[in-house]
């Protein structure tokens, strides 16, 4: 979530087409700049890809696929999205490394010139305890800073990190977009999220 002319994305985290249609109907005429984030759950559903491809051009569409594989495979995966000309953002994992991120950026330029590649850093479902269980010895903040710096060198368009790390990377990623997931209203259930913020805290 960001201020002024930037976009507030509504997370369409369901495989239900009727629920997605309801979400869009309720928000499409908002005075705010609203975009829609679609993850693997809806993208891989029966109507997902077809529905996304038919969304009006004025809708800001974020395809949150979090790609991570060898550079060639990620590149091919992005080329396979060439029919989705209305997608504005696509996520890949920063932990895939420099070569993978550069390959993704090159593939995006050939597939859809307006497609921006976002580097996902540490998922908001991780706590300091659970990130160490994966073999990391650094704090989440240090990992995010390191990954954001790498994404900048790879010339990606933006960073996805929790609001808790956003301030720390603003000075590093000056012209890159920073998108903060894990936004909850006061009193909402956190679900499987660990590092969350309210909208006012995120702003």
What are these regions (language model features)?
Residues 1-22, 167, 171:
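N-terminal amphipathic alpha-helix/helix-capping segment at the start of soluble metabolic enzymes
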Residues 15-27, 72-81, 140-150, 193-201:
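Short, acidic/polar
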Residues 10, 36, 66, 90, ...:
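Conserved, mostly hydrophobic/aromatic
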């Amino acid at each position: 979530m960001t201020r002024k002319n930037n976009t507030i994305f509504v997370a369409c985290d369901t495989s239900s087409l009727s629920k997605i249609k309801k979400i869009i109907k309720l928000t499409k005429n908002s005075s705010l700049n609203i975009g829609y984030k679609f993850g693997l759950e809806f993208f891989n559903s029966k109507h997902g890809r077809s529905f996304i491809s038919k969304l009006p051009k004025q809708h800001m569409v974020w395809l949150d696929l979090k790609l991570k594989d060898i550079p060639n495979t990620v590149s091919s995966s992005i080329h396979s999205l060439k029919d989705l000309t209305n997608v504005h953002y696509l996520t890949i994992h920063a932990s895939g490394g420099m070569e993978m991120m550069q390959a993704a950026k090159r593939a995006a330029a050939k597939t859809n010139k307006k497609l921006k590649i976002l580097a996902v850093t540490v998922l908001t479902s991780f706590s300091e305890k659970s990130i160490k269980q994966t073999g990391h010895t650094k704090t989440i903040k240090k990992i995010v800073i390191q990954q954001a710096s790498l994404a900048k060198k790879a010339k990606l368009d933006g960073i996805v990190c929790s609001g808790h790390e956003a301030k720390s990377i603003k000075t590093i990623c000056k012209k890159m977009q920073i998108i903060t997931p894990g936004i909850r209203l006061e009193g909402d259930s956190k679900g499987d999220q660990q590092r969350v913020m309210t909208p006012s805290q995120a702003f």
